[in-house]
């Protein structure tokens, strides 16, 4: 499956050129934002960890081994990219135990930067946002055009697609999810089950968002929409008055799309008709998600880009800094500006 099939059309026009992202880990830096004051005491040891070219699950296993505890005793708020330099929190459950020596877990790919005790473990999804610093190298695009596009994105946001990372190489996770859905069965391994359910659900959401981008309604509230604030999981229906709410214009309030699961969508009017039409394309997948116990939830269609700044350290390097809500993808911001190519493709005359 192509990127266009997995995500959908761009909202800002054609890409302005090409660039490389993640030539080295330092080109893609992520800092987890966690608004939880830590008490300094308790049976949970919280760790602020820097990882380089290491995924979250492997880091958790290494920390658990070094601490001498089962991997189920370690928690984290969210998964971070492997091919990146990331800093995120973990927590170890150590009732009645002293702080362990974690040096055995450390090497060039993992460093424990800070450790603090707290009364509670770190919950999944507890982080409020992620801060990104991206360096796009081998940039082949006009700076003035890039500046204008980024200013447009700062003011209008971008479609809140799930990035291709969610779907595996070539959309393999989606293919696998569709296969399991057709068999009306679930993988026994919990991590595989979670990955495929997430991929299937995200794929359906992207299909809905792609249709809203195509008809220009992704950033505009319609009667029957369900609206939500950027950092809220609650939502409310839109009537004529709500569609004129000034908070829509300043990117505080957004239309939402369905995260398919058990129960009918509370949307109405034209948005409900579109959601039903998208679901009708993949009835087995929708039923599979519901039978797996997934709840019907909502996700904002428009992604505001917090604190967006940029500069050019070199003529062919664009550095971006911004903050996104938890669960949102930095690469969907970049794709609205340039096409990303692998480092080995940048010398091809056909790229630009």
Swiss-Prot record:
The active site is at 81 (nucleophile). Residues 157-303 form the TRUD domain. GO terms for molecular function: RNA binding; tRNA pseudouridine(13) synthase activity. One of its GO terms (biological process) is tRNA pseudouridine synthesis. GO terms for cellular component: cytosol. Belongs to the pseudouridine synthase TruD family. Responsible for synthesis of pseudouridine from uracil-13 in transfer RNAs. This is tRNA pseudouridine synthase D. The gene is truD.
């Amino acid at each position: 499956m192509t990127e266009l099939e997995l995500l959908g059309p761009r909202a800002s026009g054609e890409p302005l050129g090409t660039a490389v992202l993640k030539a080295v880990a330092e080109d893609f830096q992520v800092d987890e934002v966690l608004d939880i004051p830590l008490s300094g005491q308790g049976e949970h040891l919280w760790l602020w960890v820097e990882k380089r070219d290491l995924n979250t699950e492997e880091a958790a296993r290494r920390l658990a081994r070094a601490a001498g505890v089962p991997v189920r005793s370690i928690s984290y708020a969210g998964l971070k990219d492997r091919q990146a330099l990331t800093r995120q929190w973990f927590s170890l459950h150590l009732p009645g135990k002293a702080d362990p020596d974690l040096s055995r877990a450390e090497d060039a790919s993992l460093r424990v930067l800070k450790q603090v005790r707290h009364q509670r473990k770190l919950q999944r999804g507890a982080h409020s946002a992620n801060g990104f610093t991206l360096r796009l190298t081998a940039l082949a695009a006009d700076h003035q055009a890039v500046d204008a596009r980024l200013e447009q994105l700062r003011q209008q946001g971008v479609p809140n697609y799930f990035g291709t990372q969610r779907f595996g190489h070539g959309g393999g996770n989606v293919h696998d999810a569709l296969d399991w859905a057709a068999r009306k069965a679930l993988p026994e391994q919990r991590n595989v089950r979670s990955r495929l359910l997430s991929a299937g659900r995200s794929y359906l959401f992207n299909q809905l968002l792609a249709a809203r981008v195509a008809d220009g309604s992704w950033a505009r509230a319609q009667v029957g929409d369900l609206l939500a604030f950027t950092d809220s999981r609650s939502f409310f229906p839109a009537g004529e008055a709500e569609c004129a709410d000034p908070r829509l214009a300043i990117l505080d309030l957004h239309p939402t799309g369905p995260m398919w699961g058990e129960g009918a969508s509370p949307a109405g009017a034209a948005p409900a008709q579109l959601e039903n039409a998208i679901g009708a394309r993949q009835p087995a997948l929708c039923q599979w998600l519901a039978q797996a116990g997934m709840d019907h939830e909502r996700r904002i269609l428009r992604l505001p880009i917090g604190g967006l700044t940029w500069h050019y350290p070199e003529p062919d390097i664009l550095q971006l800094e911004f903050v996104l809500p938890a669960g949102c993808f930095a690469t969907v911001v970049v794709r609205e500006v340039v096409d990303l190519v692998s480092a080995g493709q940048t010398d091809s005359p056909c790229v630009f």
